[in-house]
Swiss-Prot record:
Residues that coordinate or bind Ca(2+): 158, 160, 162, 190
Organism: Mus musculus (Mouse)
Positions that bind a carbohydrate: 92, 127, 160-162, 187, 257-259
Record GO terms (molecular function): carbohydrate binding; metal ion binding
Glycosylation sites: 180
Residue intervals annotated with topology Lumenal: 44-312
Intracellular or extracellular location(s): Endoplasmic reticulum membrane; Golgi apparatus membrane
Name of the protein described by the UniProt record: VIP36-like protein
Amino acid sequence: MAAASRPSWWQRWRRRAWARDGAKLLLFLLLLGSGPGPRHVRAGQAVEYLKREHSLSKPYQGVGTSSSSLWNLMGNAMVMTQYIRLTPDMQSKQGALWNRVPCFLKDWELQVHFKIHGQGKKNLHGDGLAIWYTKDRMQPGPVFGNMDKFVGLGVFVDTYPNEEKQHERVFPYISAMVNNGSLSYDHERDGRPTELGGCTAIVRNIRYDTFLVIRYVKRHLTIMMDIDGKHEWRDCIEMPGVRLPRGYYFGTSSITGDLSDNHDVISLKLFELTGVRTPEEEKLHRDVFLPSVDNLKLPEMTVPPTPLSGLALFLIVFFSLVFSVFAIVIGIILYNKWQDQSRKRFY
């Protein structure tokens, strides 16, 4: 059997070139398939779709200037090339960014890329920013630049401790609150009486990108963060039984007082999560019309007793006097009988 002829250098070079080109083509196809289309989340349990009508990223075309933009600016918020600045590092400023389109998704995930930085030293900066999913939009107020007694969900990145008992928690601090419109945010206690939970998050003046994710699936609220450059989500808040109506608006806001910071939003990306509900769960989880949390009693939710009317007060006093007189008469009768029996014993 004749020996096989060895390939020439040209044939060997062509084979190596084809191998390189094939690897490049495979890499190109993989990159092409990693765009904003659907992708599986958490071991294939759900598929998420980017919803552009509720998302915002660079270059922020038309934001704050075009009537056709999906986002509105409020207050001192400004559009820059690399971010949207809610407030500059100046005293007594407030700004907000609100989506114009109400969200009717059942299960969703909001990823927020933000940055908080400034010249202030330790405990001489503030106040932080908030991320909202609420019934009302574009309503300036004292709660991180938004209205008090809001209806919906608020997630707060609080950078300044107002309460004196600072040793109980380390700031900056992330917390969440669900409100039905009847609760006030307690600034003096950093929102502690009404918070669902929280965690420390060192997000100010750090060199890493800071991300926050709010995930709402089957009435289960999860808040996670990626703030240390490891590209891994860390749990912050986990709360089942959260009931949020559909048709509310996403937004973010910030406020400064005597202390200040730059509060920047780089991107907001909302994903619809599908494939997470069974047909039975679809029937069970009907729409709700007022935000609430199952089995959670908040101090401010207790209804104060209604004051008594004049007639009710009169009746209470009248019957109390009648009962007192009746008790005294009965007592006198019993006492007289006891005295009579005592005399009979002696005679």
